[in-house]
Amino acid sequence: YEEPYANGTTPNPFYDANDGNPSYLLLNDGHGNFTDATAAAGLEKKRGRRSYSASFADLDGDGDLDLLVVSDFAGVDLYRNDGHGRFTDVTREWVADPHAFGMAHTLADFNRDGRLDLLMIGMTSPAVNRLEHLGLTRPDSTEDRTMRSRMTFGNRLYMSRPGGGFEQTPLSDSIARSGWSWGCSAADFDNDGFPDVYIANGLESNQSVRDYEAEYWLHDQYIANATNHPAAGLYFKTKFTRTRGREYSYGGYEKNRLYLNQGGKSFLEAAYLFGVAIEEDCRNVIAEDLDGDGRVDLVVTTLEIWPKKKQTLRVYKNLLTGSGGNWIAFHFPDHANGKSPIGATVKVHYASHTAIQQIIAGDSYRSQRASSIHFGLGAADRIEKAEIKWPDGQTESIQKTVINASNEIKTPKDKSLGH
């Protein structure tokens, strides 16, 4: 990630920037040696994105791992894997609008239809809202004016379509405007069978609530572009010294959000009631059942600049009682039999429902979670079937599952397991 304003530059264009430090796809030969395969894999064109998160995941259900990349000043890019390690950019085929100040992502089956959905975390902007409402823009601007509001739509929830690809539905609107957002995690915190979402918020909360954010939209983006500009660099340095000397905030005082999934039809924001509406600026989020009691806990980091610069790690134990939801979990060993569990898909069939999850790395914001999967089952007291599809195409049924417990999974050896 290349920081905006460095050397008097700003990402250009602000809605499709591809002018940052390069990303790499490195192939491991099994002996600790890596080869740059970015261009050979078809990933050269957009490698200059200012990316924050990326995951290999089976997005189209064909058994191989596709690639999704979420970037600031761009949004989401989606690549289909042809099964031989060659990727094709299918962003425009799979989503109608990929644009956002992309910060993170998470994958979950939010409407319990047996397909993985994608939540991209973006940002909203009170300044843009005011400008759009008043119909104000620079008369000399050559940018597409619609991109201001599209880029500041906020979070975009893409629901998986039966025929492939994704679409935004009204469910996306109920989770879109969480603030200046960072890490996120989807987990069934109340075990009702529908994944909820926790989102970290806030950039710089300073002593003053006066916010710098409007300056970008009114001035900064018109002064510089992606080319090094010493005069612009001096201007920005002087400006930041002045505004920070006056202790301006920048995307400050935005509490974290907890969105409870209401049966796949809407989300209800309840962070304050659950005691996790953290006001300090936060970054990383991981959701994990740390104590094995069947209730998913939270791990959150803060990055604070006032009244004292500090970083903290906070662990929030889930104490929710009375929900009555049953659950089942599966834990995968790391690299047993020489295999990585990343990309393994688990389907659980119960009470006429099919729930799905994948072992995924690289989601949230600069975070890594354990190789485990947790399903809330609601009132169901048994599951009819559980099955795993491994990244190499092998499938197996999980025998002797126990609900309200974590079930250990053995990674298969390199031989057919049958179907």
Q: What are the roles of these predicted feature ranges?
A:
Residues Y1-R49, R80-A100, E132-G179, A214-E279, ...:
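Blade-edge motifs of beta-propeller repeat domains
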Residues D62, D66-S71, L118-G122, V197-N201, ...:
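Hydrophobic beta-strand segments that make up the repeating blades of beta-propeller
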Residues Y5, Y79, N129-H133, S208-D211, ...:
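Short, solvent-exposed loop/turn and secondary-structure capping segments
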Residues N18-D19, R47, S71-D72, P98-M103, ...:
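Active-site-proximal structural scaffolding
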